[in-house]
Amino acid sequence: VGRRAGGYVMTYSTLASIVKYPFSSQHAGAHGKFGFFESEASSFQRIADELGLICLSAPGEPLRYARHPLVYLMEAADDICYEIMDIEDSHKLKILSFEETRNLLLGFFDDEGQANILRRLDDEGVTDRNEQVVYMRACVVGALEHACVNTFVNHEDEILQGTFTGSLIKHIDTPLREAYQRGVELSRAKVY
């Protein structure tokens, strides 16, 4: 009762939006990443055809498609949340000091942005360091989200034509991209 045959019964758009690597397992190569097994190629081809995904493979080659546009947004959300949440978690676990965490998170903002964040914490009477980190983390996530949306809009034609390369996070404006990269490097050095 209450169950449907076929599992989740996701829409084609939902399925396509979570396939980060829209190509057959035969294209996996050294990195071992692919979106579907060769045995599922006809099912994915049906989805791709219905959604108008751009086929990048020549006839007779294993299937390879351009990403569905929503994949870029899903990937950005994943990149942002994992990286920034790991910083917050590292502070809670005392892997990173409060000063390291604070400097890293505030480093996503210019002087005015930093002053606004610190003023808000002061105005609200937030003295608990964990709560301060939570607020700064939320500000960073919001800034990165906004930057990725802008990048998506600015590169919409390339994304829709299947010519956009890389992730949205790698194309955001330099100050945020550099701050994000500092977080990645610190995580590799001290967290993982």
Q: Positions of the model-derived regions?
A:
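Sequence-structural signature of the catalytic-core scaffold of metal-dependent phosphohydrolases
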Residues: V1-M136, E145
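C-terminal subdomains that position terminal phosphate/3'-OH groups for nucleotidyl transfer/ligation
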Residues: G113-Y192
